[in-house]
Amino acid sequence: MTFLEKLRKELEVDEGVMYSVYLDHLGLKTCGIGHLCLEGEPEYDWPPGAPVTEERVAELFGKDISITMNDCRWVIDDFEQLPEEVQLICCNMMFNLGRPRFSGFKKFIAAIHVQDWKTAAKEMADSKWHRQVQNRSGRLITRMLAVGEDDES
């Protein structure tokens, strides 16, 4: 399975997949795999419940993942050199948080730079984000800790 296939699979679990426009927990129009409908996109003017094709969901996801990957490279300059599992975790967080909020995880990012996976996991756990999305963040924290365990073996 390619990196993008792995990422899509985990984001489908964390975000869900909706083939219609719906209102997210903030009342914002969303569709597909956690795609926020933006002004200028056709879905922005559609009512909740309007169907969205599988092809359109794939197109929007492709654009969102491209932005997510570029944002990860922007915030973490050595992103491409990180273990794949850490890249997946960072992309999942970036997809969920967006670049401005992800960039606020300064100690997490510093720990990633020095490959201190335990500190990175601690910083993930010690955040408002973790309290907001405990199931998702809990899985990602466990995975980050496992990267550290793999290094010790």
Language-model features, listed with the residues they occupy:
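Long, amphipathic alpha-helical surface segments
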Residues: 1-20, 26, 35, 52, ...
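Substrate-binding/active-site groove segments that recognize
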Residues: 23-45
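Alpha-helical segment that forms one wall of the substrate-binding/catalytic cleft
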Residues: 44-76, 84-91, 95-102
